[in-house]
Every structure is written in C-alpha cells, then in structure tokens.
Amino acid sequence: MMTPTIPVALFDRLLVEGISPHELVRRKLMCLFNSCAVPGGETLPPLLTRGMPEWHEVNVGDKRVLNWFCRELRAAILRYEPSINMLKVSVKDAHHQTLALSLEAMLQDESEPLRLEIAYSNGRWR
C-alpha cells in the first residue's frame, strides 16, 4: 500500500501564512542567488551543493558562454525549488562587473507566471 505524500511546496505555504506563492518563491530564489555553489560539488549530496554557479569567470562577450551559464543557472534553480514546473532564464545585459537576468517561471497550482528581473551589482544580486 502506498503512503500519501505531501508536496514540499505545501509545507512552505503552511509555514509562511499570508504570503503569496509567487512572493515565497521570489524570496527563496533571492536567497539562492546570494549563495555560492561548491566547486566540484557534483560528487556531494544535493543538499550540500545548493548555490549559484559563479559568473565572474564567464566571458560575458561570448553568447555561447552566456547561454551555457543560463543553462547552469536554470539547473541550479530547478534543483533548489521543487514548486517550479517551467523555467526560462535569459540574459538581459552583461558587462564585466554587472549581469542582468530575466526569469520566468510557472509554479505548481498557479495560473500566472512568476517574472523576475534581477541584476548582480556591487557584490550582490538584487
């Protein structure tokens, strides 16, 4: 006999009353963006490897490299946030010290997408 399971996203909603699912995911993603991935973390358990891939060493002038970074970023976000069903990540602007991204995510049980415009500036994602 199978035991019923409760989705992780439901626990988030129960713990934080009065906050919309979009706002909750936005907050969680901002925490993720301001954490760093462990280098060589492929051999560690997923719980220990959460964090954003480093972009400072990325050649922001090469579109192929930026596309690769967006794929890495998308994979990190999907590992971190199970309530996201669909995610599109794109670069809006890239320079030596700044990187602006656009995220569009469809959340479970939500009809409207979550849209985020975030940028790295002065050592922090905002």
From Swiss-Prot:
GO terms for molecular function: anti-sigma factor antagonist activity. The gene is iraD. Its main location: cytoplasm. Interacts with RssB. It holds the Pfam family GPW_gp25. It comes from the Bacteria. Inhibits RpoS proteolysis by regulating RssB activity, thereby increasing the stability of the sigma stress factor RpoS during oxidative stress. Its effect on RpoS stability is due to its interaction with RssB, which probably blocks the interaction of RssB with RpoS, and the consequent delivery of the RssB-RpoS complex to the ClpXP protein degradation pathway. GO terms for cellular component: cytoplasm. Belongs to the GpW/Gp25 family. IraD subfamily. It is found in: Cytoplasm. This is Anti-adapter protein IraD. Keywords: Cytoplasm, Stress response. The keyword Zinc does not apply. GO terms for biological process: cellular response to oxidative stress; DNA damage response. The lineage of its organism: Bacteria, Pseudomonadati, Pseudomonadota, Gammaproteobacteria, Enterobacterales.
